Design a protein with these regions (language model features):
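N-terminal export/assembly segments and adjacent metallocofactor-ligating motifs
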Residues: 1-250, 254-306, 316, 322-324, ...
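A short helix->loop->beta-strand "cap" motif at the edges of active sites that frequently abuts
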Residues: 198-204, 538-547
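Short, polar loop motifs at secondary-structure junctions
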Residues: 209-213, 551-557
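Acidic/polar loop patches that form or flank catalytic/metal-binding clefts of enzymes
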Residues: 247-251, 346-349, 362-364, 387, ...
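A glycine-rich, hydrophobic/aromatic-adjacent loop/helix-cap motif
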Residues: 335, 351-504
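Ordered core of a single globular domain
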Residues: 504-508, 512-537
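Conserved small/polar residues in nucleotide/adenosyl-binding loops
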Residues: 571-578
């Protein structure tokens, strides 16, 4: 009898392991990169990472192909032919950096806003935003401005955070999980792990998506909504839940601004503002006295209905009454919205009934004493086991901001935010807009050879925070934070090239793009963008964007239109210190 040879079933694939974060999608999973003789041999999930807990998808595993792609840029280059021709010659890092300094130094000395610096994916935004601030230009923004900023901003302004990086559903207690327009590249592995938990427990999964693919393929029910009409569907659900009384009144009174008094004084300057006391604290109607009282007073039990007179004219009513007036109308009846959303009135009512049943017939009770924000003590925690997730599918529309706010409002009406079984934030969220920085870039915040007077991106709270001049004109090249787009929390990267070419609101001298392939990915106008990048001034013959620096890891479409190309690191590259020591001159 022959003896079978001993086979090593777990051979060592590496002599070194580096830990990093995967950038193959927006999920940001932790990975272990195995190297042998300095070469990447294998990529696996990091079991100690909180995002993916060791899970890695096929795209993440294929990161090795990205690292060794033949399209990787190997050295700095300068353009020697017309823009778009792809004619370059390699140059040294010393020459490349000196060229960049020669172009940028005069701008910082004379007028920093003549530099427009815009980046792609936001993983490096802490560094790139800081660099822009130190340079002194207000013209900085990142990828989010034409991706899912409506979701992030809508969430921050409504409840202090949105989905994805802000938190996640309570996978262990949720009874009904609804996905609105979710693509597989946002929160990929955590969502898959969560869906696995739900399916194992027998919880329901509903998909609202124009196509039944990906996650929708494993859902228990699918609503094929007409693209761009999710908000109308959501508001119809709001109407049905309010009509049926299936909303969490106690939650709204205690933890939202539903009882805050709003001034109704048509034509007056204070119309639509919150009623405040002399200290600026928002007021509610005290159920015991029927009079206004600070919403922060622990002794006050606020009312959701009522009316009080306002000194100087008009009345003030709870915000909840304005919501009821707006949505308890025939405009949002299922029969009225059905033709537009592509879903029958009967099915819309069924979805509302499913929400109500999960939230109120299956409420979660945890016998755990706790103290709320007012200092009031409670014997138990009561949760509404309904959770939701949405991203670009509902946000990337002209009505995306308000659609996202409607979805967050629906969660609040059900009482399913920051409650057992619902959506749970992770630190440091929730953070309301006033806890975030305000954007800097007003004329008094921009000065030669001086850092910008604050962060270039942020959240405006009123007209006084807009980045405009004394005449009301936009001060940023993308017109973000102006009357054109006052709540553009991540800036508007997709407007940069067209505005710079048009000289509206002004011209720029240098455009610096980092990992941002705008020649290809620019509001579905790639041909127009390529034409703009090569457009010349008829009087001078010079390009309307005089100088363009581009930093990327690959020879993308944008590289062909750059004047100076700077290779960039990948997430699988050595550390910046190692990279600099091996590839850059000491003078850099």
């Amino acid at each position: 009898m022959s003896v079978e040879p001993i086979v090593d079933t777990a051979p060592a694939v590496s002599d070194e392991v580096r830990k990093t974060t995967c950038y193959m999608c927006a999920c940001r999973c932790g990975i272990n990169v195995h190297l042998r003789d300095g070469k990447i041999r294998y990529i696996e999930g990091n079991r100690d990472h909180p995002v993916n807990q060791g899970v890695l998808c096929a795209k993440g595993s294929a990161g090795i192909m990205q690292h060794y792609s033949p399209a990787r840029l190997q050295s700095p280059m300068k353009r020697v032919g017309p823009r778009g021709s792809g004619q370059f010659e390699p140059i040294s890092w010393e020459e490349a950096l000196q060229t960049a300094v020669d172009w940028l130094a005069p701008i910082r000395k004379d007028d920093p806003k003549k530099l427009a610096f815009f980046t792609g994916r936001d993983q490096s935004q802490a560094l790139t935003g800081w660099w822009a601030q130190q340079f002194g230009t207000p013209n900085f923004a990142a990828h989010g401005g034409f991706c899912s900023v409506n979701m992030a901003a809508g969430g921050i302004y409504t409840l202090g955070g949105a989905f994805w990086e802000f938190g996640s559903p309570d996978w262990d207690l949720t009874e009904l999980f609804i996905l609105f327009g979710v693509a597989e590249d946002h929160d990929s592995n955590p969502i898959k792990m969560g869906l696995g938990k739900l399916k194992t427990r027998g919880a329901r999964v509903i998909s609202v998506n124009p196509v039944q693919t990906g996650y929708a393929a494993i859902s228990d029910d699918w609503y094929g909504v007409t693209p761009g009409t999710d908000g109308l569907l959501i508001l119809s659900l709001v109407r049905e839940l309010m009509r049926a009384g299936k909303i969490d009144i106690d939650y709204l009174v205690r933890y939202t601004n539903a009882p805050w008094l709003v001034i109704r004084n048509p034509g007056a300057a204070n119309d639509g503002l919150f009623l405040r006391d002399a200290d600026g604290t928002q007021q509610v109607i005290d159920r015991a006295t029927g009079k206004p009282a600070p919403h922060t007073d622990a002794k006050v039990k606020a009312a959701l209905q009522g009316e009080v007179p306002v000194e100087g004219g008009g009345v003030a009513v709870p915000a909840f009454m304005l919501m009821a007036d707006a949505y308890l109308t025939d405009e949002y009846a299922p029969e009225a919205v059905a033709p537009q959303v592509g879903i029958s009135a009967e099915r819309i009512r069924q979805l509302a009934a499913d929400l109500a049943e999960a939230a109120f017939a299956k409420e979660v009770v945890i016998e755990q004493p706790w103290t709320d924000w007012k200092g009031e003590k409670h014997d138990r925690m009561v949760g509404r086991p309904v959770s939701m997730h949405a991203m670009r599918g509902i946000s990337a529309h002209s009505n995306g901001f308000q659609t996202c706010r409607a979805l967050h409002m629906l969660q609040l009406l059900l009482g399913s935010v920051e409650a057992p079984g619902g959506f749970r934030f992770k630190p440091p969220y929730p953070k309301p807009p006033h806890a975030h920085p305000k954007p800097a870039g007003r004329p008094d915040q921009v000065a030669p050879e001086t850092p910008l007077g604050g962060a270039p991106l942020g959240y405006v709270l009123g007209p006084e925070d807009l980045i405009i001049g004394a005449d009301g004109a936009p001060q940023r090249i993308d017109k973000a934070y102006s009357w054109d787009a006052p709540m553009s929390a991540h800036g508007m990267m997709h407007m940069v090239i067209s505005n710079a070419v048009a000289g509206d609101p002004y011209k720029v001298d240098v455009m610096f793009m980092y990992m941002a392939n705008m020649a290809w990915n620019s509001s579905m106008n790639t041909r127009g963008v390529m034409d703009m990048l090569t457009e010349t001034d008829p009087d001078t013959g010079e390009y309307k964007i005089p100088k363009l620096i581009y930093s990327d890891a690959y020879s993308s479409e944008m590289v062909a239109y750059a004047d100076l190309v700077l290779p960039c690191l990948l997430y699988t590259s050595p550390s910046p210190r190692d990279y600099a020591a091996s590839r850059m001159p000491s003078s850099a």
